[in-house]
């Protein structure tokens, strides 16, 4: 049996700013961090959804409660790029 491929993780400055705004809600931040880290092992986990986008070929979203992690997968570089973390009502603008 072969080992599962581990993807690298990159996080955009915009996503970092979004996460910093949540620093008061430590429980939510822990859940989001765990979900982001799990994408390195499984970039297409159950419940993720591929989104249509003009900017990215492989744009996905992952639900974490009322929040959405928006990310792209670059298969040629074996990397997951965290683009943003948004509340559900804001998640699908400008993708």
What does each model-identified segment do?
Residues 1-8, 20-21, 27-30, 64-67, ...:
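Enriched for short, Lys/Arg-rich terminal
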Residues 11-15:
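Basic, amphipathic "hinge/linker" alpha-helix immediately C-terminal to the N-terminal HTH DNA-binding motif
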Residues 23, 27, 40-43, 55, ...:
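Short coil/turn residues that cap or connect secondary-structure elements
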Residues 35-38, 88:
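Conserved short hydrophobic interaction patches
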Residues 37-62:
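A short, surface-exposed loop/turn module that caps and links secondary-structure elements
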């Amino acid at each position: 049996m072969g080992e599962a491929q581990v993807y690298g993780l990159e996080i955009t400055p915009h996503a970092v700013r979004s996460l910093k705004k949540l620093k008061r809600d430590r429980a939510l931040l822990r859940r989001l961090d765990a979900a982001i880290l799990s994408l390195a092992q499984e970039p297409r986990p159950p419940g993720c959804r591929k989104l249509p986008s003009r900017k990215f070929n492989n744009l996905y979203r992952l639900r974490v409660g009322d929040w959405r992690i928006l990310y792209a997968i670059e298969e040629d570089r074996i990397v997951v790029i965290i683009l943003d973390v948004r509340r559900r009502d804001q998640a699908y603008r400008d993708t």
